[in-house]
Amino acid sequence: MIGGGITGASVAYHLAKAGWRDTVLLEKDELTSGSTCHAAGLVTQFNPSPTMMRFRRYSIELYEELGVFEKVGGLRFASSGEQLKELQRGASRARGIGLDVELISADESARLMPAITTRSLHGAVWVPGDGHLDPHTATFALAAAARKLGASVLTQHRVTGIELTDRGSVKAIQTDAGRIEAEVIVIAGGIWAPQIAAMAGAFIVSTPVDHQHAALLAVPGHELPHDMPCFRDPDNLVYGKSEAGGVVLGGYEADPVARWIDGVPWDHAGTSLPPDQARFEPLLAGAARRFPFMGEAGIVKLVCHPDAMTPDSNPLVGPVPGVPGLYLAAGLSLNGFGGGGGIGRSLAELITTGESELDLYPYRPWRFGPVHRDFRYAAELAREAYRYYYYLRYPYDSDEWGRPKRTSALHTRMQDLGAVFGAKHGWERPDYFQPGRAWRRAGADQRSFGFTRPPYFDRLAEEHRAFRERVGIIDMSSFGKIEITGPGALPLLERVAGNLIDRPVGSVVYTQLLEKNGGIAADVTITRLASDHFRLVTGAGYVNSDLGWLRLQMQGGDRDVELRESSDDMSVIGMWGPHARDVLARVTDDDVSEDGFPFMEAHDIRVAGIRVLAQRVTYVGELGWELYVDPAWAGQAWDHLMAAGREFDITPGGYRVLDSLRMEKGYRYYGTDMGLLENPFEAGLGFAVNRDKWASIPREVTRRLRTLAIGEEEYVPIYGGEAVLDRSRVVGRLRSCAYGFTVSKNLAYSYLPVQLKPGGEVQVEVFGRLVPAVVMPDAVLSKLEIKR
């Protein structure tokens, strides 16, 4: 383990506990001399991520076992009506993942914490199991426990290099005090992690972002009791705990500072950076709005320290593709003490058994890609992620900083059509269109309409109708594309794909990539372009994830296989609807008839003389094609299709409408609807599994992904994660959500007990009220129901 903070100590402890006695924890200075030494030490279980919530719950159990945790409870205030709605939504999501929290009134909050004013207080979430600890005491206690189990802890050992074998796996660590052979290396080096990983030729992404907190003196007559609950006030951007009658106060600045984006000085240690009082003043003012007497409190010390932030504010936990034996527990993004205990346990499980009880996929270290090698761009994303750590971010809001980064060859045409651009993995891509209006970039748009029906709802309905009733067209160039070539390509894909891949050249296969236990690692299409050449197509945000996962599956005995991302090599135009064939037939002499161009095939055709690889697939449940074209010719291909489609009222659509279209047909979205903890039969995807290959996956399941119709025809603000109840008992949580414009229903997916079949009734907790819902067939829309 490299790094003597709470996470490194936790990994060392859990490996030693698992029986790995030859475990060594290395620290370049003294224990807790990195970000750990400046942490405030607050720990809450409240988090919308099932995995992080479980990390935090276990961390508290571990700290209690070590005798270092003060369980005083925690209050999260709502200082605005919108924040109260967010807390209501958060409480429902917490219940949906098994955390029992209580939403209480302003008066009840004041009874638990008499020091506050209830002015502008709309309520709070109360979590009695929350609390705080002393960072130094906790880390040293965990390191001592690791030593007791046989681990070694070596301070004043700075790592200077990582040796690899001829096959690229880890071999040894070089330090300024000598060499240590190791078959497994865990980088838990905080803000130095990217530099340490680079020693092994690995690329990871995190940026040091300044975080400030202060110790405030007790105010005479307003001394705070030592057992006062911890508090968090997102509207005022602050958190705190009592200490010596005063308070340790921290917060999240609206314009945070990123530093050392090209590399952190090795000699930086536990000393604070020069603090910035001017940047901290708004946080003091925010605290005084909830604790008026804090305006009189003197500052004992203001501390400024950089924390490692990733572009999505999620940690980096797991193996590093391409370097067997190298693991990460870094980029914790202010989840150090909350996540440290659980991260250490899960990573130790992964190292010793090859599996983790929890779904670590959201934290995979390889999810970022070449676009993030631009350190300034990565830093802007990290700064924005930090900004929204407390500041209310609505579900439909888009990133704003660091844009534009990547644009497709069709970007100017999208602008001319009035696109409202969102951002995904650096790509600018249309969310929806406003014909006749100037294009713009979406940002914090939902702040203007809150948790209500979006003002562009009717526009989405029109785009939806185009795909269902006429023909719609969309720029899908941001698709992730991976070329898999060589004599080892087919054996690799057959080993990891649920479906049968060995089909004729020109076949397109819809499949999931599966872990050995049947857990779903990806949801993709694979096109066979030649006997030893396959193209995998995935979502824009998953291309690096899928590429890295495939590299992790490669075995020493595999024949030569080359994996290469090709996302920028081709533009993609999607066109679907009842008249899609009519449009395509007008611009090509090739046979695109039902018999001449069957479903799930790929043909080379000419569109107005331009060479195009056409794939007859659909993600919207209508006839159509994905058209892969050289970016240099993409604009002309688009223009010809638009001209040919004019008589059918062809309409451009954005990515927002895809959820509505796909959910009416029962199509899934990876990450939201299924992941490593679900198998294809639970996800309703058993049709895509070759049972001869995967006989080990149990067909009989206890839960199943179901479609729900929630409420009546009127729009219901559901966003995913809300608790689903059956006779007052929580039985699941919502996954994907969308309004189905053809069927006029609020649709959502949820894993439910198999006893709840179509026709069954449940309830969904939506902003504090229970809304009736009906279990529907997977596809609520059949072809016969499509309105012409």
Where does each model-flagged region fall?
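Conserved, structured C-terminal
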Residues: 395-423, 429, 441, 455, ...
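C-terminal catalytic lobe of FAD-dependent flavoproteins
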Residues: 235, 271-406
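Glycine-rich phosphate/pyrophosphate-binding beta-alpha loops
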Residues: 42, 48, 130-135, 237, ...
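Acidic, proline/glycine-enriched N-terminal capping motif
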Residues: 367-514, 519
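Glycine-rich FAD pyrophosphate-binding loop
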Residues: 16-36
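Flavin-dependent oxidoreductases
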Residues: 10, 42-44, 162-275, 282-294, ...
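Flavin (FAD/FMN) cofactor-binding and adjacent substrate-gating region
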Residues: 65-66, 70, 79-149, 154-155, ...
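Dinucleotide-binding Rossmann-like beta1-alpha1 core, especially the glycine-rich loop
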Residues: 40-112, 235-240, 246, 278, ...
